[in-house]
Amino acid sequence: MPKIKTVRGAAKRFKKTGKGGFKHKHANLRHILTKKATKRKRHLRPKAMVSKGDLGLVIACLPYA
């Protein structure tokens, strides 16, 4: 059996946590920030966990994580 390839884009976007979940950076914090409220930008700053519905897709993309 050949090795399963890791999706490199996913490897750069997701980090595995100690309990087996995955964390990711929020979207909407790259450009056009002047019209966004400070509160909105502040809440987008911390990392978020991948939701249960998307977890299977992320695990499939990162077989060795």
UniProtKB/Swiss-Prot annotation:
InterPro entries: Ribosomal_bL35, Ribosomal_bL35-like, Ribosomal_bL35_CS, Ribosomal_bL35_sf. GO terms for biological process: cytoplasmic translation. Signal peptide: none annotated. SUPFAM superfamilies: L35p-like (SSF143034). Keywords: Ribonucleoprotein, Ribosomal protein. PROSITE patterns: RIBOSOMAL_L35 (PS00936). GO terms for cellular component: cytoplasm; cytosolic large ribosomal subunit. Residues 1-22 are annotated as: Disordered. Transmembrane segments: none annotated. Residues 10-22 have a biased composition (Basic residues). The keyword Ribosomal protein applies. It holds the Pfam family Ribosomal_L35p. The keyword Ribonucleoprotein applies. GO terms for molecular function: structural constituent of ribosome. Belongs to the bacterial ribosomal protein bL35 family. Part of the 50S ribosomal subunit. This is Large ribosomal subunit protein bL35. It comes from Escherichia coli (strain K12). The lineage of its organism: Bacteria, Pseudomonadati, Pseudomonadota, Gammaproteobacteria, Enterobacterales. The gene is rpmI.
